[in-house]
Amino acid sequence: ASTSEVYGDPLVHPQPETYWGNVNPIGPRGCYDEAKRFAEAMTMAYHREHKVETRIVRIFNTYGPRMRINDGRVVPAFVSQALTNKPITIFGKGTQTRSFCYVSDLVDGLVRLGKSDERFPVNLGNPVELKISEFAERIQRLMGTNSPISYKPLPSDDPKQRQPDISKAARVQIGRAHV
């Protein structure tokens, strides 16, 4: 499995699979982003050289049960902070966007991709984009918390927008998010 991180801080929005990305190879996020890009390149090379069936899925922000609280992802961080009445921490101004996909929708897409004939990368995720500040407010409302929102500096290389173009997934009948 690959990731939307292969797009880096994208200059194209939403991100189609044909977009090569905007990754800073020596930036703080570079190791992860480039490792996923390298894995895609090796997968395609192996497919071409050895005629092995392969699939590449670029997974966008996924959430669901059993997420680790301290893994650095925004969903468990916000929920944990809201449950403990700690400030909900937003990095930057909260204008950066993400598209959140429930894990059951992702699994459905993975199964469909596995059964398809598609050999090139496919984006899997929810095409509905949400500002991080709006997401924090939604968590406050759903959790019924008094947790204030706190703002901290945006880490360098943090993507400003993240939204999958899922037209290819729809075209090859892999599906889209329902939850």
Placement of each model-derived feature along the sequence:
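Active-site proximal helix/loop that lines the substrate pocket
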Residues: 3-8, 61-67, 95, 129
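Hydrophobic structural elements of the Rossmann-like NAD(P)H-binding subdomain
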Residues: 1-2, 57, 78
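C-terminal substrate-binding subdomain of Rossmann-fold SDR/epimerase-dehydratase oxidoreductases
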Residues: 16, 61, 76, 80-176
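Acidic pyrophosphate-coordinating catalytic loop
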Residues: 67-68, 159
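Catalytic helix-loop patch of NAD(P)-dependent Rossmann-fold dehydrogenases
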Residues: 5-56, 68-71
